[in-house]
Amino acid sequence: MRLRTVKLAILDTSVYIENFRTGRFTQQIAESPFLFRGISVVMHELLRGARAPIEREFALELAANLRMYTLTERIWLDSGALTARLAAAKDYEKRKVQELSFDVLIALTARAIGATVITLNRQDFEDIQQYRRFQLMCWE
């Protein structure tokens, strides 16, 4: 009997928010060949942006039902250095640097666990890929 290799994926916050609001990716997620994992930074972003009780419940339910990964010290340190390099290279404003720092944390965590990042935010993740290779899938 041949064993199938399981492919891991992390859905970026942008995918969760869009699917929560519109249901646009429900079928795509259900039929995906990936085994989805959660990471603490995505849960942080979802909870930080939750305004209504149903949004908070959604984020907490995700955290309870996904196998969660927490960022390591090495990822935090690498993320700081990488975000600074990107900010300098692209001449980003302070707010953009703050937003990008979460995407860098997501990318580096996915890389560390061998997962694919699935996002709607193509440009920022492709910019990150210029400095660190990781698997990326962009949904439209």
What are these regions (language model features)?
Residues L11-D12, G38-I39, Q98-L100, N121-R122, ...:
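Histidine- and aromatic-rich ligand-binding microenvironments
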Residues M1-V42, L47-L66:
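Short, well-structured N-terminal submotif of metal-dependent ribonuclease cores
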Residues T22-G23, G49, L82, I128-Y131:
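Residue-level signal for well-ordered alpha-helical positions
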Residues V15-Y16, V42, I75, I106, ...:
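Alpha-helix capping/helix-boundary segments
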Residues P53-E57, L86-A87, F134-C138:
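Short, hinge-like loop/turn segments at secondary-structure boundaries
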Residues L3, M68-L120:
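Active-site neighborhoods of divalent-metal-dependent phosphate/nucleic-acid chemistry enzymes
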Residues M1-L8, A107, R111-E140:
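Acidic, PIN/NYN-like endoribonuclease modules and their adjacent C-terminal/linker elements
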